[in-house]
A protein has these predicted regions:
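Residue-level structural signal for beta-strand termini and adjacent loop
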Residues: 212-213, 226
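Short, well-ordered beta-strand elements
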Residues: 219-228, 235-236
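A short, aliphatic-rich beta-strand micro-motif
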Residues: 208-210
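Flexible loop/coil segments at beta-strand boundaries within sensory signal-transduction domains
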Residues: 215-217
Length: 250
């Protein structure tokens, strides 16, 4: 069973605690967070509350997850091109479809169409995301959110359909916009399950995933703690406390 989009909830420390810790459940790219994952995150928020924290809610994620993800693909494509250009120089020949598996070929071909202006725009967006999270941490010390939106998938969960594979094979014939659409479709199902970790790769914040829950089928469920740059100590402090409280589940 799955739930619809959820709003973010922030946990404000009372005088009994030194730190302020928000938690966020809203799916960054418009998908769904499973009810079991939601339950575990709320249980950990409840622990904050029982430890003397006051829970309140906010309506909006400070970062546009779809915008962030699309920019991530643009930069990844451009960096894939740079990687293969270096290989071409070493090998003294052009890279071809037969040098790599299909998904890498798609990223390579998408990157060939990325302009300097595209790259500069996304780089500016990333600075804006980092600033938004820095402002969040001006008020709140540690962010609590799911590690993933659902429990571990089956091995074939992210198999690509034949129609998409055909388009991927001919991506070099498509426009810049169509190439980016192919990249989005290629990763869409997997990113719907794993939408919560990308922002830290971009903003440079430290994060830690802790195994604090299990589904009815016995699958592990983690929550993620995120701090401001340079504050790994807060994450390790909370992780140690939760371990001492025997909250970890293996």
């Amino acid at each position: 069973m799955e739930t619809d989009l959820l709003i973010g909830t922030f946990v404000n420390a009372t005088t009994n605690s030194e730190y302020l810790s928000p938690f966020l459940l809203k799916h960054p790219i418009g998908g769904k967070v499973s009810s079991e994952v939601e339950q575990v995150v709320r249980q950990m928020a409840k622990k904050f509350e029982l430890d003397g924290y006051e829970v309140s809610e906010i309506a909006e994620d400070p970062i546009n997850g779809i915008e962030l993800q699309k920019g991530f693909y643009l930069i990844s494509g451009a960096e894939t091109v740079v990687m293969f250009q270096r290989m071409e120089k070493q090998l003294q020949r052009q890279m071809t479809r037969f040098d790599m598996e299909l998904m890498t070929w798609v990223m390579y071909q998408s990157g060939l169409m990325v302009t300097g202006a595209d790259y500069a725009r996304v780089a500016g967006d990333w600075d804006r995301y980092a600033k938004a999270m820095m402002q969040l941490h001006d008020t709140y010390d540690v962010l609590l959110l799911p590690t993933v939106a659902n429990t571990a998938p089956k091995q074939d969960a992210y198999s690509l359909d034949a129609n998409l594979i055909e388009k991927m094979e001919h991506i070099h014939e498509l426009s810049h916009e169509d190439r980016q659409e192919i990249v989005w479709k290629m990763f869409e199902s997997s990113v719907e399950d794993t939408p919560f970790t990308q922002r830290m790769n971009i903003t440079g914040q430290p994060a830690i995933s802790l195994p604090v829950g299990r589904s009815q089928e016995g699958m592990p469920i983690g929550v993620q703690l995120v701090a401001a740059k340079g504050r790994e100590d807060l994450l390790l402090m909370i992780a140690e406390q939760w371990e001492q409280d025997e909250l970890w589940k293996f």
